Amino acid sequence: MSASPPPSAGAAPPAVRVGVLLPRLPEEPADWLAECAAYDSAGADALWLDGGPDPAHDVLALAAALAAATGRARLVVALPDSVPQAALLARALATVVLLSGGRLALAADSRRCAELGAVAPTVPAFRRLAPAGPGYEEPGAGRWTPAAAPAGPDAWRTALAGAAERGVHGLVVPAGQRLLEALRLGVSAERHTRPNRPTRARVTTERQTTRRSS
């Protein structure tokens, strides 16, 4: 094989690309993402994500977060050695839980909810009610039911009030301009509470207060 010809006189040498070996994900993922975004904005050619042979977090989930936080650098992910599928899923879920600040929940049918509970017991799983009925059941909270997009603020208030009266915990509404406008107007921020029966402790307290005042 012939050698590459030497660069012509006066030609600039080829630029050396810079890859940044990222630190391990700390307890404050927002700071980590901000640091990664800073390297990207500063001109790094690649962000190198290597969690070692047995990483504490799922590197592909971290790469997804990096893809949203950065815009130009190549994302180089060192995949760990093969591990059981359940362990991969548990690690991925734990990573998203950390990145989201604990906001992650799952949705599945009853059988799948049981499986997910064994893999990730700290992640709540919304149980799909069909064919028993539309919507989902949130553990420890209540039922989420589908609802149509609001025709306007008044219709949205009526829908929220009706859901509260029926004991519905939440509504699942298709994305759209009407819903966006209702949310921007703060209509959904109005307090729509479900009727609750007084608890035994509350009844006892009320009776004690009445006796003291009499």
Question: PLM features: residue spans?
Answer:
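Internal, glycine-rich beta/alpha segment that forms the wall or movable "lid"
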Residues: S2-P14, Q85-P150, A155-R157
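C-terminal helical cap(s) of enzyme catalytic domains, especially alpha/beta-barrels
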Residues: R112-A120, Q177-S214
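Short, acidic/polar
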Residues: P26-Y39, L88-T95, G152-A163
